[in-house]
Amino acid sequence: MQLRNYLTETPQYHFYKEQHRIQTYEYVNSKIKQYHNLGNVKIDMSIHRALHMMDSFVDPSDPDTSSSNSVHAYQTAERIRKQYPDDKEMQVCGLIHDLGKVLYIFGEPSSLVVGDTYVVGCKFPQSIVYYDTMKDNADFINPLYSTECGIYTPNCGIENLTLSFGHDEYLYQVLQYNQGKHRITDKFQQIIRFHSFYPWHTGKSYTHLMKPGDEVIMRNVINFNNFDLYSKEDTEFVITTEIREYYKNLLDEYFPEILKW
């Protein structure tokens, strides 16, 4: 099974064409401001409820699966459990990594919920999927944003970059806002924040903006991505009662309280 095979004139192509058009530096910052510390959008919801909401969500940017996102969540977690049976936190990370896609309940379009992420505020690298469509982005010809570093300084660190907005950043903000209500450590919060940052962790772009220590984050993300991406090859996967019960108990352990979203 060939994964991440992006062809033109497909639903994925038209999705990215729209995402690349609207996600300018200015617009992305307006969304980050809206959702920073969850802004005014604060609802009470358990992690179980958020996972259940993925039962009816299919990622329109993904050419590799037409399954609901909840199936992919359990697939990823189970593949991790087979290789790391004692690493409970990594299993939980596999299960929850896409739960930021609940953004759709706030009326956000798919172009602000799913898809690969990339840096705004500097030159767009050709490692971005459907790179040619980046020419529709107003920042493409903006002299302030079209140099290698743009508004950033060399080696400023990936945590100081502004990435296109979507479910990664939103779930990261949820976890940050709810510190003390869960047991997810910084290592796995970073994996969640950067797991869709394919131009960086797979395309090896933006290395001039990395600071010492960022290579550790990259290694962690790449390791996680092996489970996130390749779990989709298991087309016969079935969520059994045992699987559901195992992860229910695991989520209760790592998320003992209701979260603000």
Summary of predicted features, one role per range:
Residues 35-71, 150-158:
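Active-site flanking loop/helix segments enriched in acidic
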